[in-house]
A protein has these predicted regions:
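N-terminal Rossmann-like FAD-binding beta1-loop-alpha1 element of flavoenzymes
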Residues: 1-24
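Central helical "cap/lid" subdomain
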Residues: 31-32, 216-264, 303
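Short beta-strand to alpha-helix junction loop
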Residues: 80-86, 119-128, 167-185, 299-308
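Helical element adjacent to the flavin cofactor pocket in flavoenzyme catalytic cores
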Residues: 166-216, 220-224
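Active-site lid/adjacent beta-loop-alpha segment flanking the redox-cofactor pocket in flavoenzymes
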Residues: 260-355
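C-terminal catalytic lobe of FAD-dependent flavoproteins
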Residues: 318-400
Length: 400
């Protein structure tokens, strides 16, 4: 297993559940990069299908944007990988208990409804709250409800009066680093080993990978190899004759504390997000297309401009945030597709190799897809076949 982020740790854990031990190699450590800095919000899966119906941006309009924040372009749907969202979301409450027992770590899971705020002007233009809910109702099986301004102000007294209410839908959250750590420790108890080192190349025999070569000169033997290395997938996938296109982008957010705790409900408006966490902290972020910065040079430096924009934006939504104390300004590289839709995972077996696999390019959703991605990849590696319940998904997301 190359990569000790949420995806790699999940695959290692689920392989362990099948009696298959892993050696997880990472040039740094467990969840040091984006997985440990994520928002770690598990969104109710059908929300994305409903969201697609609200998107009218033509494909050609997306070209040249740093990153499009929608998940779709005409002719391509998140339905191809919706199973990853759905299975992960539906499993999380049980998974949290499982990881506490097997990994010895409280991942701080809790339900956190998410509300997309709507101004009076937007409500009038849409023709009322029922019109705003219609795309969600049309999908079927989507829990989306209108919460009016009075109810929101009971929860958030300082909410900007321009907001008349919001569309609320289910969501959950975990603490990102603790989540990956729990999976890693659970995997270790099932026989996994974690090794620090940078993989430079592979040793092969015919159509099989026999091991990996580390920068230190060490060679590690392997019965199978999985690449779960996010935006660094390019070079190693090319060595296997199947270069995977990837666009490294940078996203960042703020961890903050307030004198009083906020209710566990996410607020979103104008591409600004306020995410109260179970531990009393608040994640503050801006998430528009302009806020994903192309970092093909793999520069992971933080932006003071983005920090100030986030602080100003969230304070307009919830003025009490002017009293926030910044605990950490953090960010890291994400793996996006090189062309629209920019968020499209790659999962499966490399076509020219019997025992080489990949799970990458999850964009900013790696943590929230990792439970299902790990389980499905483990089944594929163990049985050599795509799981029937996700066969079409594997066909659409396969490398090559």
């Amino acid at each position: 297993m190359i990569g000790a982020g949420a995806i790699g740790c999940s695959i290692a854990y689920h392989l362990g559940r099948r009696g298959i031990t892993s050696r997880v190699v990472d040039r740094e450590s467990i969840a040091v990069r984006a997985s440990g800095k994520a928002w770690a919000i598990f969104t109710y899966a059908p929300y994305w299908l409903a969201f697609e119906r609200c998107v009218t941006t033509p494909a050609e309009a997306l070209e040249g944007l740093p990153v499009e924040t929608t998940k779709t372009v005409p002719g391509v749907s998140v339905a191809d990988w919706l199973f990853l969202h759905e299975a992960s979301y539906n499993r999380m409450a049980e998974f949290a208990i499982e990881l506490a027992e097997r990994g010895g770590v409280d991942i701080e899971y809790c339900e956190t409804p998410s509300t997309d705020l709507v101004t009076a002007e937007e409500l009038e233009e849409a023709g009322g709250s029922e019109a705003l809910l219609q795309p969600f109702r049309a999908v079927g099986g989507v829990e989306a409800d209108w919460i009016d301004g009075d109810a929101l102000r009971e929860l958030f007294p300082s909410l900007n009066p321009v907001y008349e209410g919001g569309i609320s839908h289910p969501a959950g959250q975990v603490e990102p680093y603790r989540f990956s750590l729990a999976m890693a420790q659970a995997a270790e108890k099932l026989g996994a080993e974690f090794v620090q080192g940078e993989v430079l190349d592979f040793t092969t025999q015919d159509d099989r990978i026999t091991g990996v070569q580390l920068a230190s000169g060490t060679e590690l033997q392997a019965d199978a190899v999985v690449l779960a290395i996010g935006p660094w997938i390019g070079k190693l996938s090319a060595k296997l004759g199947c270069p995977i296109g990837c666009r490294p982008v940078f996203a960042e957010c703020l961890r903050a504390m307030l004198p009083v705790d906020l209710p566990l409900r996410t607020l979103a408006a104008d591409d600004f997000y306020i995410l109260p966490k179970k531990n009393g902290e608040v994640i503050l972020a801006t998430y528009g297309a302009k806020d994903f910065v192309d970092r093909s040079d793999f520069d992971a430096s933080l932006s003071e401009e983005t920090k100030l924009a986030a602080l100003e934006g969230v304070a307009r939504i919830l003025p009490v945030l002017e009293e926030a104390t910044i605990v950490e300004h953090r960010g890291d590289l994400l793996a996006m597709a090189p062309t629209p839709p920019y968020q499209k995972p790659v999962m499966g077996r490399f076509p020219e190799w019997q025992n080489a696999y990949v799970a990458t390019r999850f964009g900013g959703d790696g943590v929230c897809m990792s439970p299902a991605a790990g389980e499905l990849m483990a089944e594929l590696i163990d049985t050599g076949k795509s799981p029937l319940r996700a066969g079409r998904m594997f066909e659409r997301l396969a490398p090559g």
